[in-house]
Amino acid sequence: MQVWTYLDGRWLEGNPAIVGPMSHALWLGSCVFDGARAFEGVAPDLDLHCARAVRSAEVMGLEPQLTAGEILEIAQEGRRRFARDAQLYIRPMFWAEDGFVAPDPSTTRFCLTLNEEPLPQPRGFAVTRSQYTRPLPSSAPTDAKAACLYPNAGRALMEAKRKGFDNAVVLDPLGNVAELASANLWLVKDGVAITPAINGTFLNGI
């Protein structure tokens, strides 16, 4: 799999060593990211994903040193390292290098990774309801695409797979349907697309 990462003004190939055991992001979870797709020569809503990455960093108390527009330019530069029709996953990331419990915002770092990621084939899939729920906004940074939220989603997904299902429906703390463990949830009924109402417990999809 071809992978390119932009870090500190350079493009690095493969899976470079970026954080260490003393990095705040590794041991105290101050990492945010976003994920966009490129396929057939287009990257829909890439600008919106870049903007959300910046907002997520700010929610986590970080100090992003790049604007959404600058991140977009880096992403477009990275796309040119692949075939025009390549199916890519584009992931800008911010994290703190230093701090104890609270991140030190002055140590905020940035990278952007692009990797080949074929789109899944459309097919049916089976879901189950998870015992794990989304957190309240008062207990977790639910308005950011924060890495610290994903272990709970991972538990829900592993639980579903142990039961023989492909994914899990995750509820909010009040019992409302929120999302799937690994994606926003949509269904179509009578020609109308339906998705759960945004209530602050999960991230609004782009």
Predicted regions and their residues:
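Helix-start/capping segments and mature chain N-termini
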Residues: 1-77, 95, 103-206
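Ordered, amphipathic secondary-structure segments that act as subunit-interaction surfaces
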Residues: 75, 84-93
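An exposure/low-complexity boundary signal
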Residues: 82-84, 101-103
